[in-house]
């Protein structure tokens, strides 16, 4: 494809028809990948800025890479801000300031659809069918809180299936972590009272809760029910301890405390979460592509991207001004369909101290990040020299597979760069064959759901299975690389600087064969365990070079081992998940009258094997092709297998 004009000349040509109105513009590279999205109050004036002579290096590189340009007119600046944020989230352009880690925060969910509800960990922005508390900064925060609540209030933590199948109390009852409602050790009314206490605690009404518990303790004491009174006393003590440890605040109720700091052109944004006056943890973020950007710009882009994914509190407290504050507030309100939002920068008082503390934490996080970043930079330079690369690696892909005699086979790819592992880029490849157990049990499932629990990772489309793949590492690698290079043809912006394959000389030939087939020349190396398969004696195989080893004490050797081990562990994890899922699905296969069609209908209707197990007989009969007698048989069989 020959392009007539690119770069600044292209922008000049677009200026002729560019309107003097607000809107959003998009720059594309030669492969028509979006490389930058920008907003403007006046599109013509903004584009004119790109043909000036005093541009910074980042902008010059961006313009040099621009081969196509499009723009959209909007009705208002808020609409332009909103569209820009949505397009950045969708395309992740490399020259935009990006929030890489955008996974949603976890919540504590209290079920409301059971006589004896339990508390669960929940992750997702859609909050329905229950009472939710949070968000929390990490799963660790949620798990710690759940453990403390279970000790204090002793609500059940088991699944409905386990609950319904009990004939005697389980271990949780014996260690005083549950009141065993499954076998009638507590009645519904008393259990509901406990649930109400949990709600009060999680909603921050701890003072009222402790007052009510104190009154109840006195009543029980006056009735000579000293054992029950002592239990309430212990609960009050435990609540006081948890409050002290959690850092309850009377300064803010529902708020996010957000501080931004900068050092050597790198930024850290630290977020502290407060809900119902309780600290719910903190987490640092390190936005990318911030070269030549100001704090105002970085913080504005952070807020717009962050609150596309996260729940918005009543108040956002920040430590630095942002551009277009009122329009940012309106955009966040529209994104989240809310009517009220307050963003403030406190000058003095308790809130100012909170945001100052967040800034101190942000600076510490940034310093730790920069140390790690500098080490990675040094290692990347060594990798460039060791493997004869033309440039310092921005992206390294590491491949491995896992199987048991060819069954439940998966291939994986993990990705590393200058900032460490990029887990959003990890991939899982299903390599099931017609003869494998996984194939026979998992056939009703889409490739997207084939590996249970790996929803954070993409599974490449499954190619037609081969009967001769069983136990053949070379064929597995051939399939993985064929599918990966096919995708790279459509995603040239994700071409790795280096591929590392867990394997030896034979694997080297397979990689070369697939590379030649696709007419691609990506640098690659095969890394094998070496003599006696001992760690530290790894051998490296490259085309046209003698096999070589490295001193096991060298930092680069330790780094390469970390890369290899990450891929290996990821492969084993997904192999086990696939094997576990296949074993579970076999319970459906054992039921007379359940063939592939009905099994597929069950999984499609309920969404997962666990949901099928949790279903009642009446719910099972709602599935097309499942009558009452078959539903009863399914219910009995699944509950017998649990």
From Swiss-Prot:
SMART domains: GIYc, HhH1
InterPro entries in alphabetical order: GIY-YIG_endonuc (IPR000305), GIY-YIG_endonuc_sf (IPR035901), GIY-YIG_UvrC_Cho (IPR047296), Hlx-hairpin-Hlx_DNA-bd_motif (IPR003583), RPE4 (IPR022439), RuvA_2-like (IPR010994), UVR_dom (IPR001943), UVR_dom_sf (IPR036876)
The GIY-YIG domain, residue ranges: 20-97
Function: The UvrABC repair system catalyzes the recognition and processing of DNA lesions. UvrC both incises the 5' and 3' sides of the lesion. The N-terminal half is responsible for the 3' incision and the C-terminal half is responsible for the 5' incision.
Family: Belongs to the UvrC family.
GO biological process per UniProt: nucleotide-excision repair; SOS response
Keywords, alphabetical: Cytoplasm, DNA damage, DNA excision, DNA repair, Excision nuclease, SOS response
Gene3D superfamilies documented for this protein: 5' to 3' exonuclease, C-terminal subdomain (1.10.150.20), GIY-YIG endonuclease (3.40.1440.10), UVR domain (4.10.860.10), UvrC, RNAse H endonuclease domain (3.30.420.340)
Superkingdom to which the source organism belongs: Bacteria
Subunit structure: Interacts with UvrB in an incision complex.
Domain UVR residue range list: 207-242
Cellular compartments per GO CC: cytoplasm; excinuclease repair complex
Name this protein carries in UniProt: UvrABC system protein C
Subcellular location(s) per record: Cytoplasm
GO MF entry, a single one: excinuclease ABC activity
A Pfam family: GIY-YIG
């Amino acid at each position: 494809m020959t392009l007539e004009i690119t770069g600044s000349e292209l922008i000049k040509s677009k200026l002729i028809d560019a309107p003097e109105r607000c809107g959003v513009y998009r720059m594309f590279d030669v492969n028509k990948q979006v490389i930058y999205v920008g907003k403007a109050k006046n599109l013509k004036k903004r584009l004119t800025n790109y043909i000036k002579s005093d541009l910074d290096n980042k902008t010059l590189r961006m313009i040099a890479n621009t081969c196509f340009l499009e723009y959209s007119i909007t009705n208002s600046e808020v609409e332009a801000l909103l569209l820009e944020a949505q397009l950045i989230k969708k395309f992740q352009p490399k020259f935009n300031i990006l929030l890489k880690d955008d996974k949603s925060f976890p919540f504590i969910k209290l079920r409301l659809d059971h006589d004896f509800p339990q508390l669960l960990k929940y992750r997702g922005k859609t909050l329905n069918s229950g009472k939710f508390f949070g968000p929390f900064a990490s799963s660790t925060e949620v798990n710690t809180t759940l453990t403390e609540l279970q000790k204090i209030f002793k609500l059940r933590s088991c699944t409905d299936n386990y609950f319904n199948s009990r004939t005697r109390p389980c271990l949780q009852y014996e260690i005083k972590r549950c009141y065993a409602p499954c076998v009638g050790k507590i009645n519904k009314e008393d259990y509901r009272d406990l649930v109400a206490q949990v709600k009060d605690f999680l909603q921050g009404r701890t003072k009222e809760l402790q007052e009510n518990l104190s009154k109840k303790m006195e009543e029980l004491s006056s009735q000579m029910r000293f054992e029950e009174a002592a239990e309430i006393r212990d609960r009050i003590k435990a609540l006081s301890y948890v409050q002290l440890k959690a850092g309850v605040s009377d300064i803010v109720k529902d708020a996010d405390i957000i501080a931004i700091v900068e050092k050597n052109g790198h930024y850290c944004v630290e977020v502290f979460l407060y809900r119902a006056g309780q600290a719910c943890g903190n987490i640092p973020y390190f936005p990318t592509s911030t070269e030549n950007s100001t704090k105002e710009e970085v913080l504005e882009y952070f807020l717009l991207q962050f609150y596309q994914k996260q729940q918005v509190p009543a108040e956002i407290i920040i430590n630095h001004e942002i551009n277009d504050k009122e329009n940012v507030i309106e955009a966040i309100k529209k994104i989240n369909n809310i009517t009220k939002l307050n963003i403030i920068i406190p000058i003095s008082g308790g809130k100012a101290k909170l945001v100052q503390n967040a800034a101190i934490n942000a600076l510490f996080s940034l310093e730790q990040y920069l140390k790690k970043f500098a080490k990675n930079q040094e290692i990347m330079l060594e990798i460039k020299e060791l493997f004869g690369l033309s440039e310092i690696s921005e992206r390294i892909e590491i491949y491995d597979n896992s199987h048991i005699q060819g069954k439940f086979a998966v291939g994986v790819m993990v990705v590393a760069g200058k900032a460490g592992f990029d887990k959003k880029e990890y991939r899982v490849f299903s390599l099931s064959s017609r003869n494998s157990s996984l194939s026979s049990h998992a056939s009703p499932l889409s490739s997207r759901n084939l590996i249970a629990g790996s929803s954070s990772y993409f599974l490449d489309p499954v190619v037609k299975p081969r009967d001769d793949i069983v136990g053949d590492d070379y064929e597995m690698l051939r399939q993985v690389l064929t599918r990966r290079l096919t995708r790279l043809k459509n995603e040239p912006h994700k071409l790795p600087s280096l591929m590392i394959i867990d394997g030896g000389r034979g694997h080297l030939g397979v990689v070369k064969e697939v590379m030649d087939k696709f007419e691609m020349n990506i640098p690659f190396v095969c890394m094998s365990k070496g003599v006696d398969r001992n760690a530290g004696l790894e051998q490296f195989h490259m085309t046209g070079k003698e096999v070589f080893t490295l001193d096991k004490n060298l930092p680069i050797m330790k780094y390469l081992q970390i890369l290899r081990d990450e891929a290996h562990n990821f492969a084993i994890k997904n192999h086990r998940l696939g094997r576990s899922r296949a074993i579970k699905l076999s319970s459906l296969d054992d039921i007379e009258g359940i063939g592939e069609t009905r099994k597929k209908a069950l999984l499609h209707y309920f969404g997962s094997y666990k949901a099928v197990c949790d279903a009642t007989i009446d719910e099972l009969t709602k599935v097309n092709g499942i009558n009452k007698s078959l539903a009863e048989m399914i219910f009995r069989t699944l509950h017998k297998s649990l």
